[in-house]
Amino acid sequence: MAKITHFKGYSGPVTPSSIPKPSTPVDPIILTVQDGVPVVYPGCHALGVRVVHPANPKAPAKNMGLVMFYLPPHTINPPGSHETEETYVILEGSGTMTFANGRTTQVQKGMFVYLPPWCEHGIENTGTDNLVVLIATSPPNP
């Protein structure tokens, strides 16, 4: 494990916020996956659910997206790339991720995979159970 750090508040360049702070408290939005909006991906027999995303009227985030991605056994989401940053959190199952130049890595429950903008990536469920991935994007994918 990495060295433990202490949170010292938000740091970095001070820039004016593009989101003004409201004068009254903001309430959280509490959801389940069932509150999300299903999405299918071209060339893939998996299902995504946009839980926090501009496409979901129950949690219409503007600056991020959270998608639950369910990949059945022996299913592939083919490689592609996009402008958004993305992080895959492997919640269940195991598989193989493919990157540019044919590079591959095995993924399993508990792993995080950070994908910078334009990082080519694809994922295959090589296991016998569903591969369940929480995908965080910023900004959200269209």
Spans of model-derived segments:
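A generic "binding-loop/recognition-motif" signal
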Residues: 75, 83-84, 103, 119-120, ...
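Short, conserved beta-strand element in jelly-roll/cupin
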Residues: 68-72, 81-97, 136
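Short beta-strand His + acidic residue motifs that chelate non-heme Fe in jelly-roll/DSBH
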Residues: 77-79, 97-98, 115, 121-128
